[in-house]
Amino acid sequence: PLSGVYLSYEMLQSMDQVTAAVEALEDGSAVMLDLKSIYGSYYYTSSLEGASAPQDWDTQAVDALITELRRKSCYLIARLPAFSDNAFALAHQSEGLPLSNGALWMDAEGSYWLNPASETVQTHLKDLCSELQRKGFREIVFYNFYFPESANISYSSDLSRREVATAA
């Protein structure tokens, strides 16, 4: 039988709820954790440049949870957004998806998106994956991992949409 649990951002806000879920797990179970928001906040202690936690967030509790899950030999899976990241987009505006007026494109959730074809963005994601691997995560599930469709996005004039999509 398969055994596992998904610890969402909402669950991570209540460590009592998380503790109950983890105690019920058999050793070696799969556990997927939300570890970053679309706004660029990290839910664990990250050493990446510009990484910060949400206000009033206990990253040490999440770090301790990861340690406990590793002690139980759990199969750790990280879940995080790939290209929607306000903090990175604002810190590296040239790596965001621009509108024709130069402002950054924002999705319906109020999140700025990064250019999936950008080498800087791809390196950032690789660094994030490497950090999570060092913390014991065996898989990473990216969401918001696509080129957004919007007539308002002004892709570089020297690249067509097809070329941009092929580059990623």
Question: What is the predicted role of each segment?
Answer:
Residues L2-L12, F83-S130:
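Active-site-adjacent "subsite" loops/lids of carbohydrate-active enzymes
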Residues L2-Y6, A30-M32, S73-I77, R138-V141:
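Structural preference for beta-strand elements that scaffold enzyme active sites
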Residues Y39-P81, E149-A168:
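Aromatic-lined substrate-binding rim segments of carbohydrate-active enzymes
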Residues S8-Q17, I38-Y39, Q55-D56, D85:
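Acidic-and-aromatic substrate-binding clefts and catalytic sites of carbohydrate-active enzymes
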Residues D107-A168:
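Polysaccharide-binding and catalytic clefts of secreted carbohydrate-active enzymes
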Residues V18-A24, A61-L65, L128, A167-A168:
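A general structural detector for well-ordered alpha-helical segments in enzyme core domains, enriched
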Residues A30-L35, D58-M106:
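Glycine-rich, aromatic-flanked loop segments that form ligand/cofactor-binding clefts
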Residues Q17-Y42, E131-F142:
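Catalytic domains of carbohydrate-active enzymes, especially glycoside hydrolases
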